[in-house]
Amino acid sequence: MEPTKFDVQFAAVRRAVIDRVFARMNDMQREAVYHTEGPLLILAGAGSGKTTVLIHRMINIIRFGRGVDWPYAPADATMEDFAFLADYLADPKPENEARAMRLCAIEPARPWEVIAITFTNKAARELRERLERAIGPEDASSVWAYTFHTACLRILRSNIDRLGYNKSFTIYDEDDKKRVIRAILKDLDLDEKVFEPRQVIGMISRAKDILQTPADFAAQTNGEFFRSKVAEIYRRYEKQMCEANALDFDDIIMKTVQILQEFDDVRTYYQNKFRYVMVDEYQDTNHAQYVLISLLAGGYQNICVVGDDDQSIYKFRGATITNILEFEKQFRNATTIRLEQNYRSTDVILNAANAVIRNNINRKGKELWTERKNGDKIHLHQANNQDAEAEYIAQVIEEQVRDGAHYSDFAVLYRNNILSNNIERYFSQAGIPYRIYKGRDFFSRAEIRDMFAYLWVVQNPADDLRLKRIINVPARKIGAKSIETAEQEAALAGISLFEVIEHASSYPSLSRSAAAMERFGRMIRTFQQEAEFLNLSELYEEILEKSGYRDALMEKDDEDSRSRLDNVMELKSNIVTYMEKNEEPTLAAFLEEMALYTDADEDEQEDDADQVLMMTMHSAKGLEFPVVFVAGMEDGLFPSFRSEGNQEDMEEERRLCYVAITRAKRQLYLTCAERRMMYGQTIYSKLSRFAGEIPAELVDSNVSSRPQQKFSEYDELYRRQPVRSVGEAYRSALTSQPRTRTAAAVCDFAPGDQIFHAKFGDGMVTSVKPMGGDFLLEIAFEKVGTKRLMAKIASAAMRKK
């Protein structure tokens, strides 16, 4: 039906009112906010205001629905309504706002019909807080603005019993997983030096990232011994996790996908529930997350993803850039909107970033621009050595601070932590306050893990791993042999370890420890009963008191014990803070929130002291600073020598450079050293090729007096010294070990070498270690995982590519 004249007039004034609400946005941001129906890819460049777009898009969906482009007036609209809207447009009085918003709404979404998924708790919290200010706390609290893991946990808590788990399941972290894997290796009589637990955990995690079950993994081993054994470890790991009623972080997403795929009623419920699905940082998603998102959006197909393919830098964590590059193929009739106006950096910095990233082939393509013109040129400084480089960085900071800058204006970025040591030393000598931007030391401390273990066991007594951690902490005269015997009894009876401990006197084999075990069991049951009527803080105090943990620390009365006691009490502060922020605080919810605490969230808790921040380029993603130093701009360091010869890896390194450059708001310094001491050797390096990709007119450099010279030609400056790559330096460092009286071994392989093995196929050497006149090679093979081989034996079946 053709719109009437009244429809056209009403739609025009409605659009004008809505435009006023979003008047502070630029044209492309507003287009993204207004596009509500169907698949949408928002390519958001660095500093382009993507969070603002996400927030306002949710506001538009909840307040106005399809009102922006709806060609008709509401069915019950009158001329008086039209006049009211027109008057409101001319004079928007606050008392008239509610009615005006109602008149502009067409099929608005209810808040609980919107889900916005992020990667960090910090980002999710920011979304919720800004929504609260815009639509009120009641409506904002109904929106599912969560991390992937938190959203999945909400689904699992309601549905995981369909997979044979109890809804009070436990979440295992990396340390817990390692303990389980080590126990399995012991049961299978496998050598940890060959089946290194961290490597095995990584292989299992990568399998879960692509939704491979143990059976799927086993079917693809091709008879290879190593992978076949890992398949058996994976099978046993999953069995033990289920018996312990526990999930690891990868399971949280994988099990959610499994439920949505296998149970039609659950899938239909969530597809009908979520009219609008939004995902932040889409370039960082893996395959499992892509499948999850596709399932949730399968009802209405109103999926909006926000991301930047040029900032995809987490391949090592399982992220695949394919998800964002092929969005239009995966979701039919998708629309793509590019946010290219940058509000962070100067034009010079953006032009440099554009020039570098333009060299990548696998990208969607966009050009960042800004209205902040005539910025400072990029400073490229080549020092004689790493000491002079560190001294230069310190001097620049000191000079700017004397001129009125704050230490907190500065950040020093580097590709690898190995570069921070020298800079730290010079900062200390110069009295420059600094902090290494890092993760969650507090939650890794033994005493904190002990207290969390108590809380988890109260929540889930079937958690054998945490139970074994605390059953004799503090000492209760329950020895390792008794615990092992109890485990055997539990396995024979097909019950949990806790059930055996509760009734230990029923087992003759446990007679010596039975009384102590049953006392422990009664204590845990008491805590469970108290959890029904005590608040979390009071329950924590009860556990500290009745477990004897606090007394054990106080009795030692040494500095270490006092420090540990302080940490234990600091955890109580976390509990109190959690209680203050949540209307209905529960033990299960608190444990979930703490388990999902991320590195970024932990570092956010640091005070905002006036100090220079130092961090890896990966850690810098999402941050911004007035002045940024990128140290170690040398081929072999950055890009890493490991990316040489591999286009996919080199493009990821270039994206990392793009991220580093775009952290700077006002000034960018790129520093390098003509020679650098590494691995006990002096390395003569080439200037990073990424520096060579920046147009010369954007750079103020001390490298050459010829301003038009391309930086890729600066190799000539090094001809007076032999140019040695970092990979070659590894080899040199290894082969220059002190010689024994027997003939010294010389290794033909170095880290970074691409090789072919007659049995194991293609691979890359990741480390070389001298060992008994030979060298132990660690090689990451594409098909069989990482293997350790002795060089003399391997050489007969292996060659460089």
What are these model-derived regions, one by one?
Residues 2-24, 59-70, 76, 83-104, ...:
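Conserved RecA-like helicase ATPase core segment
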Residues 278-285, 306-307, 630:
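Hydrophobic residues in beta-strands of the RecA-like P-loop NTPase core, especially within AAA+ ATPase
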Residues 36, 119, 139-143, 160-251, ...:
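ATP-hydrolysis module of ASCE/P-loop NTPase motor domains
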Residues 615, 632-786, 793-801:
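C-terminal accessory regions
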Residues 1-167, 171, 268, 322, ...:
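P-loop NTPase Walker
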Residues 219-223, 406, 420-432, 445, ...:
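Conserved helicase C-terminal RecA-like lobe
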Residues 48-54, 69, 74, 89-107, ...:
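Helicase P-loop NTPase motor core
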Residues 24, 71, 81, 88-100, ...:
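Conserved helicase/translocase P-loop NTPase motor core
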